[in-house]
Amino acid sequence: MSEQFQMTRRSMLAGAAIAGAVTPLIGAVSAHAEEAVAKTAHINVASLPRVKVDLVKPPFVHAHTQKAEGGPKVVEFTLTIEEKKIVIDEQGTELHAMTFNGSVPGPLMVVHQDDYVELTLINPDTNTLQHNIDFHSATGALGGGALTVVNPGDTTVLRFKASKAGVFVYHCAPPGMVPWHVTSGMNGAIMVLPREGLTDGKGNSITYDKVYYVGEQDFYVPRDANGKFKKYESVGEAYADTLEVMRTLTPSHIVFNGAVGALTGDSALKAAVGEKVLIVHSQANRDTRPHLIGGHGDYVWATGKFRNAPDVDQETWFIPGGTAGAAFYTFEQPGIYAYVNHNLIEAFELGAAAHFAVTGDWNDDLMTSVRAPSGT
């Protein structure tokens, strides 16, 4: 192994080999964290009820109520950081991923507006890198990033008020290494529901039967001189080559939920005719254009903020990079629906596609074959 990749545990934690001089930044972060904690210590949440939530792996979402029951609560979550090797396509391409709870994307968290999110963030000593978490739904301290820097073996607890309603990205944002961590899979989403639940913007309630979470991820896997994807012994060894690919702004893969085909075949998203489905879709880094082939977005919050009235009857919706969006659809016909990023090169060539497998009875009034294909 070359000297470039012979990083000691200490140098990796400090970021000396891969992120420049981070140690002064860590000191500044610690001082800022102490000041911020002191300023907010007067907030009394001890009297609020507490709810502990067990998160589940996407595309599924933990049990929750769509309308708040009672007043604000403290909702407790735990995320454990896991650095792990994953396979991202049928050709066996490997990536040293950085993950929350072992999945790409990390789990979707659900609370109600004005609840308090209390997150325990664990960086086990089996990891090699420093991490943190930035919630786009939070106010202050770099979205919590300044208060949650954890070295391997560290645990921290962050609490913030979910004051804005919508779906929001969260991601790792350690000093000097943000894009590397984000494009290595370290991102997820949180849904902050209005206390009265979703509405159509005209005061009418919208309720869903199912919710699925699709996390779109761009990966940047280096190739060797023969064009084959390279493999590495560790996440640190891959850093320099990965950074070169990242700087081209040209992903090797753009996938849903961590791998090409992860939400197809036996893993397709399930629904039935008449079911109302909410699709939460995040992209922490690049713009995307979700489209449900054969269906629509009955109600769409493309930038994910529920205070805004939804767009209706959408064919394709635009989600800017660093954003989560939400789309609601009532399935009307059975069959296999492809759900894609409608940059079709990214969908068909790079992997940004999923399937909905929908059961039920066919409605000839909506579509029928008048004449089957045949010779003239």
Curated annotation (Swiss-Prot):
Outline the extent of the Plastocyanin-like domain: 98-193, 258-359
Q: Where does Cu cation 2 bind?
A: H136, H171, H342
Residues that bind Cu cation 1, according to the entry?
H131, C172, H181, M186
* An annotated GO BP: denitrification pathway
Q: Where is the signal peptide?
A: 1-33
* Keyword entries, A-Z: Copper, FAD, Flavoprotein, Metal-binding, Nitrate assimilation, Oxidoreductase, Periplasm, Plasmid, Repeat, Signal
Q: Name one GO cellular component term.
A: periplasmic space
Q: What is its main location?
A: periplasm
Q: Does the keyword Flavoprotein apply?
A: yes
Which EC numbers characterise this protein's activity in its record? 1.7.2.1
- Kindly state which reaction or reactions the protein catalyses: nitric oxide + Fe(III)-[cytochrome c] + H2O = Fe(II)-[cytochrome c] + nitrite + 2 H(+)
Annotated pathway: Nitrogen metabolism; nitrate reduction (denitrification); dinitrogen from nitrate: step 2/4
Q: Which GO terms describe its molecular function?
A: copper ion binding; nitrite reductase (NO-forming) activity
Q: Which cofactor(s) are needed, names only? A: Cu(2+); Cu(+); FAD
Free-text comment on the cofactor? Binds 1 Cu(2+) ion. The Cu(2+) ion is held by residues from each of 2 monomers of the trimer. Nitrite is bound to the Cu(2+) ion site. Pseudoazurin is the physiological electron donor for the Cu-NIR in vitro.
Report the PTM annotation. Answer: Predicted to be exported by the Tat system. The position of the signal peptide cleavage has not been experimentally proven.
Q: Does the keyword Nucleotidyltransferase apply?
A: no
Compartments where located? Periplasm
Tell me how this protein assembles.
Homotrimer.
> Which NCBIfam families does its entry note?
Cu_nitrite_red
Comment text on domains: The type I copper site in NIR plays a crucial role for electron transfer from pseudoazurin to the type II copper site of NIR, which comprises the catalytic center of NIR for the reduction of nitrite.
Similarity section: Belongs to the multicopper oxidase family.
Identification of the protein by name: Copper-containing nitrite reductase
Query: Which species expresses this protein natively?
Result: Rhizobium meliloti (strain 1021)
